[in-house]
Structure formats: structure tokens, C-alpha cells
Curated annotation (Swiss-Prot):
Name listed for the protein in its UniProt record: NADH-ubiquinone oxidoreductase chain 4L
Enzyme superclass (EC): translocase
EC code: 7.1.1.2
Cellular localization per UniProt: Mitochondrion inner membrane
Annotated Gene3D superfamilies: 1.10.287.3510
GO biological process, any: ATP synthesis coupled electron transport
Function statement: Core subunit of the mitochondrial membrane respiratory chain NADH dehydrogenase (Complex I) which catalyzes electron transfer from NADH through the respiratory chain, using ubiquinone as an electron acceptor. Part of the enzyme membrane arm which is embedded in the lipid bilayer and involved in proton translocation.
Assembly and binders: Core subunit of respiratory chain NADH dehydrogenase (Complex I) which is composed of 45 different subunits.
Membrane topology per record: Multi-pass membrane protein
Catalytic activity of the protein: a ubiquinone + NADH + 5 H(+)(in) = a ubiquinol + NAD(+) + 4 H(+)(out)
Main location: mitochondrion
A cellular component annotation (GO) from this entry: mitochondrial inner membrane
Length: 98
């Protein structure tokens, strides 16, 4: 395994560990999710470029589209929770149920 792959895997694992450890605040959870998506994007791009897979070259861009949608929905939920309750705790998400 080359150094680039190992660095990207470590970035993904650190983001996953941060998501598991600091899940009380919504903003930190969203930042960890973005770190995971960014490391996945870089890993997929490097793998596709190294293996010369021309048919799979759209997959990282599709991943970025889903990451942008996830970020927009997460930030809108963060704004809604913080304006309603005044704090961004993840435990407030259970209160949003009808």
C-alpha cells in the first residue's frame, strides 16, 4: 500500500473516530462527515487515475454531488434546530418528531 492510500485511509478513520467520539454537537458531526466524504473522494479519484478506468471517472463527481446535498440538508437542519432550541445538540433531533 502506497503512502497516499495510507494517508487517505487514515484521514477517513480519523474522521470516523471523530464522528463517534464527538457526536454530542451537530456541527462537529457535520464536519466529521465532510472529512469522511472528502477523503473518500480523494481515494476514489486516485484509484481511478492510477488504474486508468475511464468508464468510472464520473463516480467521484457523483460522490461530490451527494456530499453537497448532504451538507445542504445538514446545515439547514442545524439552522432549524439552533433557532428553535438555541443549541446544536444532537439529542434535540429526537424532539423534531411529530
Amino acid at each position: 500500500m502506497s503512502l497516499t492510500y495510507m494517508n487517505m485511509f487514515m484521514a477517513f478513520m480519523i474522521s470516523l473516530l471523530g464522528l463517534l467520539m464527538y457526536r454530542s454537537h451537530m456541527m462537529s458531526s457535520l464536519l466529521c462527515l465532510e472529512g469522511m466524504m472528502l477523503s473518500l473522494f480523494v481515494m476514489m479519484t486516485v484509484i481511478i487515475l492510477n488504474t486508468h478506468l475511464t468508464l468510472a471517472s464520473m463516480i467521484p463527481i457523483i460522490l461530490l454531488v451527494f456530499a453537497a446535498c448532504e451538507a445542504a440538508l445538514g446545515l439547514s437542519l442545524l439552522v432549524m434546530v439552533s433557532t428553535t432550541y438555541g443549541m446544536d445538540y444532537v439529542q434535540n433531533l429526537n424532539l423534531l418528531q411529530c
